[in-house]
């Protein structure tokens, strides 16, 4: 994924292996306990680390997290299909930078002016420079990263190890994240009850960049709660909210369907169609990358 050596087998990329790497680093540094913060796939790795050695975790912060597997699929709509097509076609740092900006930040944030330039222009130049200096991500690295997210899950035993040890947890998420969907982050928080607090902020996938002050406040509050040994019941803000939210959502859906049954069915079918198109685009992109590995054989000119 970075500049280090890259395993050729995607099976060598798992959140468990990466959590073991993090634990080895803690041992090397002599850290008995730590406040652990993870973002996106790093949040998955942090959960695995917390499940491995819960007694060594002081607090756990999960930014823009999902539960892995099918929850890694983004919301498929016209915007996401456009992004997928642009991602597959991106061959230069400039093209990749433009795609990354739309997946990392909200449009509102990118359109804000900082001096005479928009954030989009400023960040675009920074992204192009960074990608140009480090190079485009290798296919093996990308496929390994996808494999790590796709195969990630937490067993009931692992979930119990995390939530029963006594350290507080914050699940921090951007409401406009199109990569890691907010509904899946809420599920993560609900599974980690009674230890988790849900923090929803105005931002996208890189909510820590869009809302640094709010994220820092949330992290500081988490650390203070850990040091003060606050009870988990006092820490969590999800007492019954998860179930109530699901029931409310179901009621709204049924009400809408009752008001216009065929309209509801058409809307569901449209979403399914867009979802299938998105999956097909991802498969097509994967096949294109595989075919590019095979170089055509050169045939010499026939002698007359």
Q: Where are each of the predicted segments found?
A:
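Conserved alpha/beta-hydrolase "acid-adjacent" motif
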Residues: 178-184
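Active-site loop/oxyanion-hole signature of alpha/beta-hydrolase fold enzymes
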Residues: 1-37
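Short beta-strand/loop motif that positions the catalytic acidic residue
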Residues: 165, 171-173, 177
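Catalytic active-site module of serine/aspartate enzymes centered on a nucleophile-bearing elbow/loop
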Residues: 194-304
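Short beta-strand immediately N-terminal to the catalytic nucleophile in serine-hydrolase-like folds
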Residues: 36-38, 63, 172
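Conserved alpha/beta-hydrolase catalytic His-Asp/Glu region
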Residues: 94-146, 150-153, 158-161
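Gly/Ala-rich beta-loop-alpha elbow adjacent to hydrolase catalytic centers
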Residues: 38-42, 46
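Flexible "cap/lid" loop of the alpha/beta hydrolase fold
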Residues: 51-52, 58-92
């Amino acid at each position: 994924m970075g500049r280090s050596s890259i395993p050729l087998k995607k099976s060598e990329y798992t959140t468990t292996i990466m959590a073991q790497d993090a634990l080895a680093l803690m041992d090397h540094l002599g850290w008995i306990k730590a406040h652990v913060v993870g973002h996106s796939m790093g949040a998955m790795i942090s959960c695995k680390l917390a499940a491995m050695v819960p007694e060594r975790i002081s607090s756990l912060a999960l930014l823009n997290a999902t539960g892995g597997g099918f929850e890694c699929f983004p919301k498929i709509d016209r915007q996401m299909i456009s992004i997928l097509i642009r991602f597959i076609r991106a061959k230069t740092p400039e093209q990749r930078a433009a795609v990354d900006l739309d997946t990392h930040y909200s449009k509102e944030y990118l359109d804000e002016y900082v001096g005479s330039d928009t954030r989009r222009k400023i960040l675009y130049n920074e992204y192009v420079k960074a990608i140009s200096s480090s190079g485009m991500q290798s296919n093996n690295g990308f496929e390994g990263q996808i494999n790590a997210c796709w195969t990630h899950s937490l067993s009931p035993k692992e979930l119990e190890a995390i939530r029963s040890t006594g350290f507080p947890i914050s699940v921090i998420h951007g409401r406009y994240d199109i990569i890691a969907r907010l509904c899946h982050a809420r599920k993560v928080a609900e599974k980690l009850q009674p230890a988790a607090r849900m923090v929803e902020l105005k931002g996208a996938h890189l909510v820590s960049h869009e809302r640094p002050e709010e994220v820092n406040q949330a992290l500081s509050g988490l650390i203070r709660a850990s040091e003060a040994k606050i009870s988990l019941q006092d820490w969590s803000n999800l007492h019954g909210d998860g179930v109530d939210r699901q029931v409310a959502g179901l009621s709204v859906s049924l009400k809408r369907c009752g008001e216009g049954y065929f309209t509801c069915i058409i809307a569901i079918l449209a979403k399914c169609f867009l979802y299938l198109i998105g999956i097909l685009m991802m498969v097509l992109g994967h096949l294109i990358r595989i075919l590019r590995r095979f170089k055509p054989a050169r045939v010499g000119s026939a002698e007359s």
